[in-house]
A protein has these predicted regions:
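Radical SAM/AdoMet-radical enzyme domain recognition
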Residues: 1-111
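A C-terminal junction/extension of Radical SAM enzymes
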Residues: 112-172
Length: 172
């Protein structure tokens, strides 16, 4: 992937990853390419992430973030909001931790959508939780100046995605 990115220096690549394959040498290669930003998937903090992604994964994620910071690679965080983690996502401390302490540059939020072979609607946010989360994001954006983008709901507010040539569309 890094070799492909190097071939297209007129483009910038956002890649989603769990971060487990970003040791120091890979982070350095990303920095040398200069046109890659990884969005590292978490479910919240250590407890939530390890519960969903496997024991020990969160520690590997923290190591990857450290490697990226030290190499000078801008990175972000990708979070799927579910009923299991929404209470955490409604706390300022959650955002402060990732933006201030771990120095993430951006955060993508995805609201869980029950799709696939065995969709579990019980993980979907309630309407009240969606409203509360939206209000938290507005606060985080306007008062803390953290770049948090709600992948689904921002479309309503910004006339859709720029990739569809919508005037004033959002940037994803």
């Amino acid at each position: 992937i890094i070799d492909v990115a190097k071939m297209y220096q007129d483009s910038f690549f956002l890649m989603y990853t769990n971060g487990t394959l970003i040791p120091k040498d890979v982070a350095q290669k990303m920095e040398e390419a200069g046109n890659i930003t990884p969005a590292i998937s978490v479910e919240g903090m250590k407890e939530e992430t390890d519960a969903r992604r496997g024991k020990g994964i969160y520690d590997q994620i923290l190591a990857a973030m450290k490697n990226l910071r030290e190499a000078g690679v801008p990175y972000g965080v990708s979070v799927t909001a579910t009923r299991n983690n929404v209470n955490l996502l409604l706390k300022d401390d959650f955002y402060d931790y990732y933006f201030k302490e771990l120095r993430a540059n951006y955060m993508w939020m995805f609201q869980f959508m029950p799709i696939g072979r065995k969709p579990d609607v019980e993980l979907s946010l309630t309407p009240e939780q969606r409203i509360a989360l939206y209000k938290e994001w507005v606060k985080v954006l306007t008062e803390k100046n953290y770049f948090v983008a709600d992948f689904w709901n921002s479309a309503i507010l910004s006339v859709g995605c720029l990739s569809c040539a919508r005037p004033a569309g959002y940037f994803y």
